[in-house]
Structure formats: C-alpha cells, structure tokens
UniProtKB/Swiss-Prot annotation:
Record's function text: Forms part of the ribosomal stalk which helps the ribosome interact with GTP-bound translation factors.
Gene expressing this chain: rpl11
GO BP term (any one): translation
GO cellular component terms given for this protein: large ribosomal subunit
Name of this chain's protein: Large ribosomal subunit protein uL11
Extent of Basic and acidic residues compositional bias: 139-157
Disulfide pairings: none
SUPFAM superfamilies registered for this protein in UniProt: Ribosomal L11/L12e N-terminal domain, Ribosomal protein L11, C-terminal domain
A Pfam family the protein falls into: Ribosomal_L11_N
Amino acid sequence: MAGTIEVLIPGGEANPGPPLGPELGPTPVDVQDVVQTINDETDAFDGMEVPVTVEYEDTGDFSISVGVPPTAELIKDEAGFESGSGEPQENFVANMSVDQVQKIAEQKSSDLLSYDTFNAAKEVVGTCTSLGVTIDGNNPREFKSRMEDGEYDDILK
C-alpha cells in the first residue's frame, strides 16, 4: 500500500471536509468515491463515531476497513443520550440494564483486552462510570462490586 489514513467518522455521514478531506486531498484516490464507500459501509452506525482505515495505492485504488465504534459511543447509543455527565459520580445521565451491558460487551469483545464476556462487561461498566451511567439503577462502581461478588454470574458468564 502506498499509504494509510485512519480517522473517526460519524457513521453514514462522511464528507469531503475535515477530518477526511484534508487527509485524502494529496493522495491519488477519488475523494468522492472514498466518501461514498465509507458512507455505504458505516450506514448501520448512523451518527456514531466509527473508526475507519483507508489504505490506498499510487494507482488510485483503495480499500476501506471499518472498526467497531468506541465503547462510549455504543453506550450513548444504547442508553439514548448525547453526552456524558460533567460530574459522573454525582450526576447520572442515563441508566442501562445488565442485558444492555452484556450486548455492548459482546459487540466490543474483539477490541477489548478481556478474554471473556464477564471481563469485557467489567470494561463496559468502567466506561459507564466515566460517563455517569447507572446500571439497573446502581452506581457503576457498586454494580461492578456486585459483579465481582458473583451476583450476575448467571447473566454475564
């Protein structure tokens, strides 16, 4: 490959402007073709920030690989809110169910450092802590402690 460009793009909303356009401008690829291909491949992630890698050749040929959105984006989408809390330990912006945590853990399993769903769920809960999202009405730190005590083993293992 002649080069690689990595960017975060809102799903289905790539355009020739920043951050993609300035990166693609000096390359031999047709910018509109790249934008259209990215939009087609990321349409399912409507509005979520999605990592996209564009690899291109000197001939103008290109290939695109789409990653899984960041955990925070999946949580925002699943719980239905726009941005996290400015004071995540005091002001909570949303609540998620254990099933939603499990769903995100399974979606992200290939990108996380965890070897199983239980530990992947702990990573998701950690992100919930940073965003100010409760789980089944519990503070995420309290929920994580209950996970470690085995309360959710039947669901998350």
